[in-house]
UniProtKB/Swiss-Prot annotation:
Entries under PANTHER family matching the protein: 3-DEHYDROQUINATE DEHYDRATASE
Annotated Pfam families: DHquinase_I
Protein name: 3-dehydroquinate dehydratase
Quaternary context: Homodimer.
Binding site for 3-dehydroquinate: S7, E29, L30, R31, R56, R167, T186, Q190
Keywords recorded for this protein, A-Z: Amino-acid biosynthesis, Aromatic amino acid biosynthesis, Lyase, Schiff base
Gene expressing this chain: aroD
Matching InterPro entries: Aldolase_TIM, DHquinase_I, Type-I_3-dehydroquinase
EC class (word): lyase
Functional pathway: Metabolic intermediate biosynthesis; chorismate biosynthesis; chorismate from D-erythrose 4-phosphate and phosphoenolpyruvate: step 3/7
Organism: Sulfurisphaera tokodaii (strain DSM 16993 / JCM 10545 / NBRC 100140 / 7) (Sulfolobus tokodaii)
GO process annotations (BP): 3,4-dihydroxybenzoate biosynthetic process; amino acid biosynthetic process; aromatic amino acid family biosynthetic process; chorismate biosynthetic process
Function field: Involved in the third step of the chorismate pathway, which leads to the biosynthesis of aromatic amino acids. Catalyzes the cis-dehydration of 3-dehydroquinate (DHQ) and introduces the first double bond of the aromatic ring to yield 3-dehydroshikimate.
Source lineage: Archaea, Thermoproteota, Thermoprotei, Sulfolobales, Sulfolobaceae
Similarity-based family: Belongs to the type-I 3-dehydroquinase family.
One function term, GO molecular function aspect: 3-dehydroquinate dehydratase activity
Length: 216
């Protein structure tokens, strides 16, 4: 099953008021790095079953630099509240961030790494994480890499800066998450999340009514 995620930039706490309108998605990603300060956890806790909290590092595609010590403390508090978050693999290792039942991610914005490089970066998180997430720039070799990564059981893969239909294609092939924007792209190559949801719902209905269409 692929979960549809509506990615929402949070520049101020007023943006949190948009969450209820996005709950037709499976999850709402709160991109807290769009602000220079982090909201009080109790403000978002009421949505804990439907949100993914992301404080993306600038070198992995984030917007504003958040003090790493503050980010680490915030993520640890989120863990205590059982709130799902997405943390970069290297940040989790450096600051000993809890990753059990969380999303552990890695982003390659300017090159396509080898499979072994990606696997070694994520190896320690395979068993305990909720999902692994790998995003790779759409340069030579990215399709082969992402397809190979889909052999892992709990993984979401996404190409960056390519035709949005490719994200749909990787979802069909087994990627567990597809991110869409909620009016403002948070990554190149995103559909609006409602469009992504409509396409996947349609493909699911086809596969149920006529399985041979998608399976051959």
């Amino acid at each position: 099953m692929t979960f549809v995620v509506a990615s929402l930039p949070i520049r101020s706490e007023k943006d949190l008021d948009k969450i209820p309108r996005l709950l037709d998605a499976d999850f709402v990603e709160l991109r807290l790095d769009y602000s220079t300060s982090l909201p009080e956890i109790q403000v978002i806790e009421k949505y804990k079953d439907r949100i993914i909290v992301t404080i993306r590092d600038v070198d992995e595609g984030g917007i504003n630099k958040i003090d790493p010590e503050i980010k680490a403390e915030y993520l640890i508090e989120l863990n205590k509240k059982n709130i799902l978050y997405d943390v970069e693999a290297k940040f989790a290792k450096k600051y000993n961030i809890p990753t059990s039942n969380k999303i552990v991610s890695i982003h390659y914005l300017d090159r396509v790494p080898s499979y072994s490089e990606v696997f070694e970066s994520l190896r320690d998180f395979i068993k305990e994480s909720f999902l692994l997430k790998v995003a790779v720039i759409g340069k030579d070799g990215y399709k082969e890499l992402l397809s190979k990564l889909l052999e892992l059981e709990k993984i979401a893969v996404m190409p960056i800066g390519v035709n949005p239909l490719e994200r749909i294609a990787f979802s069909i092939l087994g990627s567990k998450l597809i991110y869409g924007h909620a009016g403002e792209e948070t990554a190149k190559g995103q559909f609006h999340y409602k469009v992504a949801k409509q396409i996947l719902d349609y493909l699911t209905s086809i596969s149920i009514s006529s399985p041979s269409i998608l399976t051959g």
